[in-house]
Regions:
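Short acidic/polar mixed-charge low-complexity motifs
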Residues: 12-14, 111, 141-144
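Zn2+-dependent peptidoglycan hydrolase active-site motif and core
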Residues: 116-154, 179-184
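Cationic-aromatic interfacial patches
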Residues: 1-25
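Short, charged beta-turn/beta-strand-edge "cap" motif at the junction between a beta-strand
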Residues: 12, 128, 167-175
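Short, intrinsically disordered, charge-balanced linker/junction segments flanking boundaries
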Residues: 1, 185-187
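Residue-level recognition of beta-strand microenvironments
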Residues: 85, 108, 124, 150-153, ...
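Short, well-structured beta-strand-loop connectors
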Residues: 112-123, 154-170
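Surface-exposed, glycine-biased beta-strand/turn segments
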Residues: 19-131
Length: 187
């Protein structure tokens, strides 16, 4: 595993630089069968849509300011069994695909989803190709949360939310085999 350089710039112009050495680890393998073939190997038109949607997600993550909305910590957006873990290798209909970049929380369609920390809504999309109803919150300093496969989104881009605010409802939209929430965090 290659080392990574972390550079932090603070108020007043100070800078802290650290070299990080990630430790190798093994990830779970998750086999998911029974998906529609178009959700495993999309056609060229769908691939173009997927690229456009990925661009929207990247743009939503570019928001950077000095807010520290995560200072009070995080709460779980949904309570339910963890059915998929971050980093697990996904084998879809027998074909290896990208790792899973979130935590799957099983819950029935319509279950309330709350803001795990305060933030500003940067993306609210009702139906992305893979992730279905997709919502993103910026928590400040480049830290964001994403919530995937939503049935209903109850907030709008630009809206400020507080920790515990109702923001969405669990669904089974996009590439899924059942109702659940995927919670992702990025920095």
């Amino acid at each position: 595993t290659a080392s990574r350089r972390l550079v932090v710039h603070g108020p007043g112009g100070w800078t802290e630089v650290r070299e990080l050495e990630p430790e190798p680890r093994e990830f779970d393998i998750q086999r998911i069968d029974g998906l529609p073939p178009s959700q495993v190997t999309p056609d060229p038109e769908s691939l173009a849509r997927i690229r456009r949607e990925a661009s929207q997600v990247r743009k939503a993550r570019q928001h950077l300011d000095d807010r520290i909305d995560f200072a009070d910590g995080f709460v779980w957006p949904v309570h339910g069994p963890i059915t998929g873990v971050y980093g697990s290798q996904r084998i879809l209909n027998g074909q290896p695909r990208s790792p899973h970049w979130g935590v799957d929380l099983a819950a029935p369609t319509g279950t309330p989803v709350v803001a795990p920390a305060a933030g500003v809504v940067t993306l609210a999309h009702p139906g992305m190709y893979f992730s279905g109803g997709t919502l993103m919150l910026d928590h400040g300093l480049g830290l964001s949360s994403a919530f995937l496969h939503l049935d209903e989104i109850l907030v709008e881009p630009g809206q400020r939310v507080a920790q515990w605010d109702l923001i969405a409802r669990v669904g089974a939209t996009g590439r899924v085999t059942g109702a659940h929430l995927v919670w992702r965090m990025n920095i």
